[in-house]
């Protein structure tokens, strides 16, 4: 499965020798080894530079296409969410505040959703 995530040549490396992006991809390889129907990603681009973030987003989309899996991505990175999602849900105060297609989020008139997207939401 390392080949599916672009790491065919790292099987002999120790974890300390891997970059942050490589470690994320090794995690994906481990997740797909059991051939799941659903993959849950928890903040897959957190801590990565823009290049590796794009690489991980592309990999998520590629795994969806090749393995025909459903992906559930938990992220605060709205650009990443737009890139990998067909549908988005915003959870606010423990409840789903809004769920729908990406285009619906970009053009929302919901104040809480708009504040989140604009980075102007006040912390509780």
Q: Which residues does each predicted region cover?
A:
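Conserved ABC ATPase "signature" region
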Residues: 2-9
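A short, proline-enriched helix->beta-strand linker immediately N-terminal to the Walker B motif
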Residues: 33-37
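Helical segment within the ABC ATPase nucleotide-binding domain
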Residues: 54-66
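A short, surface-exposed alpha-helical micro-motif characterized by mixed small hydrophobic
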Residues: 81-83
């Amino acid at each position: 499965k390392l080949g599916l995530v672009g790491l065919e040549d790292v099987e002999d490396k120790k974890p300390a020798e891997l970059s942050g992006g490589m470690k994320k991809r090794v995690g994906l390889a481990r997740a797909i080894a059991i051939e799941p129907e659903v993959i849950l990603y928890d903040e897959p681009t957190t801590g990565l530079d823009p290049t590796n973030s794009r690489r991980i987003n592309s990999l998520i989309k590629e795994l969806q296409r090749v393995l025909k899996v459903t992906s559930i991505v938990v992220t605060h990175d709205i650009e990443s969410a737009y890139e990998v999602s067909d549908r988005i849900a915003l959870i606010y105060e423990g409840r789903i505040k809004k769920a729908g297609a990406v285009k619906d989020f970009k053009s929302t008139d919901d104040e809480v959703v708009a504040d989140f997207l604009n980075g102007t939401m006040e912390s509780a």
